[in-house]
């Protein structure tokens, strides 16, 4: 069963899945299931969350929802450990925010053809922490949705544990 955080919809049964079905089963994307992300989720689940909600918002505003879904799924397609990278960082070395965006973009381009729009979305999803500014409306949307999903991934499990503790 494939779902986004705070959604009850089965994602394999709707138009969203048509946009990402060729990517989601790939070995590289599936590897993300083994990496913890934002404390209580996996990098795979985070990417699905960003992908799905970016798709929904872009569709609502009649923007390129297909590219948003694809870029959202691939925006964190990197495999190094962020904590190790930051601990061993030397002067002049790119920040994690910049490095992982560029690495995810390179990995995405190895996996599939990415459009200029998708490249902008993946490379700049950490704006304003990184430069330059996004070129497209869809890039601003994925940037906002990425932060929104990070907050949900951090807070929702805590709220669920709190509620479960109250009902005992």
Predicted segments, located by residue:
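Metal-dependent phosphohydrolase cores
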Residues: 1-168
């Amino acid at each position: 069963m494939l779902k986004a955080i705070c959604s009850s919809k089965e994602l394999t049964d709707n138009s969203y899945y048509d946009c990402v079905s060729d990517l989601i089963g790939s070995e590289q994307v599936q590897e993300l299931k083994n990496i913890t992300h934002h404390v209580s989720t996996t990098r795979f689940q985070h990417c699905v969350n960003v992908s799905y909600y970016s798709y929904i918002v872009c569709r609502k505003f009649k923007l390129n929802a297909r590219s948003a879904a694809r870029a959202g799924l691939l925006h964190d397609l990197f495999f190094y450990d962020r904590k190790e990278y930051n601990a061993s960082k030397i002067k002049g070395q790119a920040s994690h925010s910049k490095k992982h965006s560029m690495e995810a973009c390179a990995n995405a381009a190895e996996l599939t053809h990415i459009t200029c729009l998708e490249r902008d979305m993946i490379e700049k999803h950490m704006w304003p922490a990184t430069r330059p500014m996004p070129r497209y409306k869809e890039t601003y949307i994925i940037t906002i949705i990425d932060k929104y999903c990070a907050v949900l991934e951090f807070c929702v499990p805590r709220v669920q544990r709190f509620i479960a503790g109250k009902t005992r």
